[in-house]
Amino acid sequence: MDKPVSFLTWDQVATQLTEAKHYWICSVRPPTLEAPGGRPHVVPRWCVYVDGKIYYDGSPETRHAINISSNPNVTVHLESGWEAVILEGTAKMADKPSPELGEKLSQAYKKYKEYGYTPGPHSWDEGGLFVFTPRQCIAWSKFNEDPTKFIFEIEQDS
């Protein structure tokens, strides 16, 4: 007898996103004089999941930042292949966060305290913050039993 198929809830996936410490971000390289564009670039990042978006910080001069400035389409996935969470969406340099968002980000980043990283609510006032907005998510904890796809409504920039 086959096992019944079940689905993950968004709360289960959101918990994984909130608790995860290692995220992988895959962007696409633009063309250069040395090489054609379209080559993937993957980098591990420390991220936080706040208000339905993934935030991470870094220099605008890094490879992934250069990539998203020309092509914002990005894939983000968590470390586990057994309890997979794979998101597709867009990333961009974030505006200065509001005081409320800065506080939420600072609180969320406390999960990295054991690694000596504890940014404060105003750490991104001068920039260096990126935001990833998911379009869809594929997740599973038991591949043949509960693969689940979520599709999100995208806010239009005004």
Question: In which residue ranges do the predicted regions lie?
Answer:
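A generic local structural motif
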Residues: T9-Q12, H41-V43, E61, Y117-T118
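Short secondary-structure boundary/capping segments
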Residues: A14-T15, W46, I66, G120-H122
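Tryptophan-centered motif/residue detector
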Residues: W10, W24, W46-Y49, W140, ...
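Short, basic/aromatic recognition patches
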Residues: D2-W24
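Short beta-strand segments
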Residues: A20-P60, I66-I68, V74-L78, I86-T90
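Charged, gly/pro-rich active-site loop segments
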Residues: M1-F7, E83-S158
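Amphipathic alpha-helical interface surfaces
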Residues: V13, H64-N67, L101-A108
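Generic marker of residues within folded, mature protein domains
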Residues: T15, G37, E79-G81, H122
